[in-house]
Amino acid sequence: MHMETVFRKSTHGGVVKQDIKIKASEEGFVEDINDLKVEKERKSIHNEDDNSKSSQQKDLTGDKKDDQLESAKADMEEVMEENQRLKKHLDKIMKDYRNLQMQFHEVAQRDAEKTNTDVKHDEAELVSLSLGRTSSDTKKELSKLILSKKENDEKEEDNLTLALDCKFQSSTKSSPSNLSPENSLGEVKDDEKGTDQTWPPHKVLKTIRNEEDDVTQQNPTKRAKVSVRVRCDTPTMNDGCQWRKYGQKIAKGNPCPRAYYRCTVAPNCPVRKQVQRCIQDMSILITTYEGTHNHPLPHSATSMAFTTSAAASMLLSGSSSSGSGPTSSTASATTSALNYCFSDNSKPNPFYNLPHSSISSSSHSQYPTITLDLTSNSSTSSFPGQNYRTIANSNNYPPRYNNNNSSTNILNFSSFESNHLLPMSWSNRNNQDTHSQSYLQNNIKSAASTQTLLPQDTIAAATKAITSDPKFQSALAVALTSIIGSRSGNHHIDEKSGQNMKVTEPFPVLCSFPSTSPGDHKDYTL
């Protein structure tokens, strides 16, 4: 209808331009409509694309989450399996640990029982102290000389010997394996070459000292344990050595435990000591030494080592000279001092005076014991220089001693004058060394000044006679025995407990030997 109107207007001569405008507007409207349609279609397509993209993204996001959940579940399953494996492994480890712990307790219990058994066994075995300063060559040479001399002395009825200390033994024969250095001291000579040549005095002295140091090695079946009783407030006595405590044990009847120490001066030193309080007097400390040092001793430890070694040597000299078995009917009496030897003034004194002290020994067929009691207070007595005696070559002095099997020997050493008292103080070793050395040197010098010094040739001849003539040695030993017997004749002797001898006067014997340098005179005093 609109077209018809336009056609009429055109036919009637209407304005043609208006029709054209209308047509143009209509065409523009149509184009706009088309544009709108296209744009709408585009929007719809775009929306569809957006929807598809968003759906795809949602799908991708959901897939990712699902994958993550699945991977997390897989990881959790793996962790759970690993936990199960770890639990099984931990159970196995705990089981092995319990088994090992049980085995450890069993081993520790066995070691404790073994240690207790060893301690009990060590208490029965008695070991003597030695210096451990001799070489193997000297020991071999010394053993050969002792064996050869023993074979020659078997022909004699009585085997009497002479050394720096006074000793003699019975005629009971013993096997060469039981030889002791005391069996041939002072009689060493070269019998293998068949000559009468004797050793020089200084070599004889060195041999005697080496023999005294090797008592345990030459006679392993005769061993001694040395106990020292001293008043001490500290847990242990300061004897100069280094010790490490390796155990303790409660003894029956004594509330104080017995501590066990080992010498740590050298890594392989076998020396041990036991420390315990006395049950009767808690202020008294009992220290028992056993073993042999296999290393050089420090200067602060030499005094105690030498003193205990001398006490053990004194006991061993008596036990080795008696019968070989417990059924022996006779036993020889043995008396020896603490071997006050001074070979050189520059060296420290090897042994010390023990004032207010007593030595008690319990003799056994295999395990003799000896105790140094430094706590007794004996009555004082003088020690005059004129008590040095000259012993003549005579056998007019009959021996005085008991032939009983002694199980206990007690030697109470009397003290010296009050102005010469030397109290034992193990905490201050240097002062004791100085006072003891000065005191003994003064006594030796005063004794030597009262005698007329013989020429060196005469002294050498006398020394040669003493070391080579057994009869002279026998006579001299008998004279020494008679003098010692007269000293102990005023004291009580118990037949059951053994020989109890108290020496109220020291018995010094002055032996002078020529030195290598002229004018140098050395005195060796017992």
UniProtKB/Swiss-Prot annotation:
Region (Disordered): 40-76, 170-200
Main location group: nucleus
Stretches with biased composition (Low complexity): 170-185
Subcellular location: Nucleus
GO biological process, one term: defense response
Function statement: Transcription activator involved in the transcriptional regulation of terpene biosynthesis in glandular trichomes. Binds to the promoter of the linalool synthase TPS5 and promotes TPS5 gene transactivation. In association with WRKY72B, contributes to basal defense against root-knot nematodes (RKNs) and potato aphids, as well as Mi-1-mediated gene-for-gene resistance to these pests. Both WRKY72A and WRKY72B are not required for gene-for-gene resistance mediated by Pto, another tomato R gene.
Protein name: WRKY transcription factor 72A
